[in-house]
Amino acid sequence: MRNSNRGPAFLILFATLMAAAGDGVSIVAFPWLVLQREGSAGQASIVASATMLPLLFATLVAGTAVDYFGRRRVSMVADALSGAAVAGVPLVAWGYGGDAVNVLVLAVLAALAAAFGPAGMTARDSMLPEAAARAGWSLDRINGAYEAILNLAFIVGPAIGGLMIATVGGITTMWITATAFGLSILAIAALQLEGAGKPHHTSRPQGLVSGIAEGLRFVWNLRVLRTLGMIDLTVTALYLPMESVLFPKYFTDHQQPVQLGWALMAIAGGGLVGALGYAVLAIRVPRRVTMSTAVLTLGLASMVIAFLPPLPVIMVLCAVVGLVYGPIQPIYNYVIQTRAAQHLRGRVVGVMTSLAYAAGPLGLLLAGPLTDAAGLHATFLALALPIVCTGLVAIRLPALRELDLAPQADIDRPVGSAQ
């Protein structure tokens, strides 16, 4: 296979790196701006929740939009709108003064940026099988590379975010995010790939509601996808407040923005190694074992972090969490790609992503006030224990055995025929 055939894969991976790196900067910058002004974990959780509230609906709409308008077009438009939203922070400060960048403004702009992000991510995710075919790669290889790129982005993003906050301030740092989205747009603009353009009218969704319903019906009828979605929903709701509220609160209290970036980098670094090793791991270790081990390890590591050990210990635990969780999203992608028809893929990706975000706002809104009232130690424990229980339950779930079985039916079957 000629190297030129790898061009589409590399363009998609580069665009993913840029967009996700911009998001990584925002993960640090938005909560830091709030904590710097208000000093309250509860206020920071409001902004973090604002980024989550649009995601459930946005991911559902994104999947239908991708299957209707086309993957390439949706990716570029979504990145343009996300970039404009984050650029609004320094623009508001420039036009009305730094005091105008209050909690309400940050919450609105964070929500807008988050609302458009899922469409770009879904569009790029949906192009992976065709890019793999052009490059001569297996699905496991491109899924592992894609997840590794996401983790690499969240190494680069938070690190740049923490360093830029420490040097030029949180408001100016937002220009980094806008620039990253611009580079993502340029990469996808250069992409030429079958299936990336506007779909034929016979295969497009008939409407927004019917398109969402088709995706939901497919996921619900396929037991393995339904089970994976429920596990992801639970774990995300419990873990997300740790990364979005508890870690920023801990490091803000200690005036250590750079260390916050390092902690998030440790998670992403472990995830990078885990994702890169997924193609080899999938041959030797059952996917069901990988899944259960990841959830259990996440819960146990979070329980140790609850005792607020020294920073090097926290870093090691974060790296371990990332390492065991690195293969999880490639497993999700593999199941979707081998069971969903090409014309339905965007909707299925959107539904699976939306399930992960469904309980996010509730977890974030509870974590902030609980942290202010009971402290970081108690809140970490309150979130970690249910994750451990979820991992114990996952060990015995019969549906997860299907992760290691070949698909029983052709992926071009009708939407309602999943079993």
UniProtKB/Swiss-Prot annotation:
Induction: Induced by rifampicin and ofloxacin.
PROSITE patterns named among the record's database cross-references: MFS (PS50850)
Outcome when changing S292L: Shows higher efflux activity. Causes clinically relevant high-level drug resistance to pyrazinamide (PZA), isoniazid (INH) and streptomycin (SM)
Location of the protein in the cell: Cell inner membrane
The entry's keywords: Antibiotic resistance, Cell inner membrane, Cell membrane, Membrane, Transmembrane, Transmembrane helix, Transport
Membrane topology: Multi-pass membrane protein
Record's keyword annotation contains Transport: yes
Regulation: Inhibited by piperine, verapamil and verapamil analogs.
One GO process term, biological-process aspect: response to antibiotic
Gene Ontology cellular component annotations, sorted alphabetically: plasma membrane
InterPro entries xrefs: MFS (IPR011701), MFS_dom (IPR020846), MFS_trans_sf (IPR036259)
GO molecular function annotations of the record: efflux transmembrane transporter activity
Pfam families per UniProt: MFS_1
Transmembrane intervals: 7-29, 44-66, 73-95, 100-122, 149-171, 175-197, 218-240, 260-282, 289-308, 313-335, 348-370, 375-397
Family to which the UniProt record says this protein belongs: Belongs to the major facilitator superfamily. Drug:H(+) antiporter-3 (DHA3) (TC 2.A.1.21) family.
Job of this protein: Efflux pump that contributes to intrinsic antibiotic resistance. The pump uses the electrochemical gradient as a source of energy. Confers resistance to rifampicin. Confers low-level resistance to tetracycline and to several aminoglycosides, including streptomycin, gentamicin, 2'-N-ethylnetilmicin and 6'-N-ethylnetilmicin.
Name of this chain's protein: Multidrug efflux pump Tap
Protein's organism: Mycobacterium tuberculosis (strain ATCC 25618 / H37Rv)
Gene: tap
